[in-house]
Amino acid sequence: MKYALINCVIYTKYDVLRDFAVIINGEIIEAVIPQAELETGIKTIDLQGNNLTAGFIDLQLNGCGGVMFNDQTSVETLEIMQETNLKSGCTSFLPTFITAPDENIKSAVKIMREYLNKHKNQALGLHIEGPYLSIEKKGVHRPEYIREITPEMKDFLCENGDVITKMTIAAENPTINYTPDFVKAGIIVSVGHSNATYEVAKAAFHKGATFATHLHNAMSPISSGREMGVVGAVLDSDVYTGIIVDGVHINYGNVRIDKKIKGDKLCIVTDSIAAAGAPPELESFTFVGKTIYIKEGRCYDANDTIAGASITMMESIKNAVEYVEIPLAEAIRMSNLYPARAIGIDDRLGSVEKGKIANLAVFTPNYQVIGTVVNGKWKEN
């Protein structure tokens, strides 16, 4: 079907357009043209002056809408996550599977493959976060499962690199030495949950790691003028990094500093769990065998350890604009274009451009998402 989205403020890759229209033909953006040049008789959808942008891409999502991928590992769970995401403008995501036994990881890979055979341009492959981490920076991950990789598991993951998009590995875990193998298999290696020194973290990036998982969280900090830790290595390297902009995981001042240093390598992620997009009456849920409590937007376990976020991508953009003072157009790029580049899919997703997949989000000036387009299909919230 061919139609045009009209009467909107269009955020393209680098421009903000008014009095333009986006023509969608099938699943593709056919053109972005002045509205006055639309052909007579084309079907139109009036967006009533609201913002139109490429759909947001969340590179770290454990769960949402009341479900968790680790605890309900199924195609149906991923479908619930996708439908929940659409309500906040997120059209694509990396389902994140955290530290678990090998058989559970293999099951997650199998389910991811089934999902990808059924759906395209939505869940974009698996993010395996652990178990090859640091005990000292485990966060909510279960320490009894944190380990080095076995040769058999390394081969399995490499053989399934077509459905595993990203892996988080601690820089000091010996598993990091297999980075060239993972990269050759098409897997992006991200440094995270790491207590490494600056030097060890830099070595991980030299081995081929190109991303860092939730900057500042579960990684050794800059503790003095001499000890720079993983945070210092990330800020001093030309790698992408995700950052959680909920005001709980890190101070907004840190986000402001990070943005000045990292520029277009800083990607907004949610790291959200079941509470995101769930009914307000949800007070607790199970995550990898632990009871997680929700209070005032904060998710924590019985030891008061932060267990993930309850924020959406749209809320994150709002926070970036209102509390970090990042211009809206740039906060949007941090949520679609830069994540797309980070995982190498910006040739088809991440911006409103001719020839790209029509995955789009429409939201009001007060950050209320009123509709999305996925693979060219319009859906009103």
Swiss-Prot record:
Q: Name one GO biological process term.
A: protein homotetramerization
Task: Report the InterPro entries cross-referenced here.
Answer: Amidohydro-rel (IPR006680), GlcNAc_6-P_deAcase (IPR003764), Metal-dep_hydrolase_composite (IPR011059), Metal_Hydrolase (IPR032466)
Designated name of the protein: N-acetylglucosamine-6-phosphate deacetylase
Listed NCBIfam families: nagA, PRK11170.1
Which spans are transmembrane here? Answer: none
Q: Which pathway, metabolic or otherwise, does it act in?
A: Amino-sugar metabolism; N-acetylneuraminate degradation; D-fructose 6-phosphate from N-acetylneuraminate: step 4/5
Q: How is the cofactor bound here?
A: Binds 1 divalent metal cation per subunit.
Q: Which cofactor does it need?
A: a divalent metal cation
What this protein is reported to do is described as:
Involved in the first committed step in the biosynthesis of amino-sugar-nucleotides. Catalyzes the hydrolysis of the N-acetyl group of N-acetylglucosamine-6-phosphate (GlcNAc-6-P) to yield glucosamine 6-phosphate and acetate.
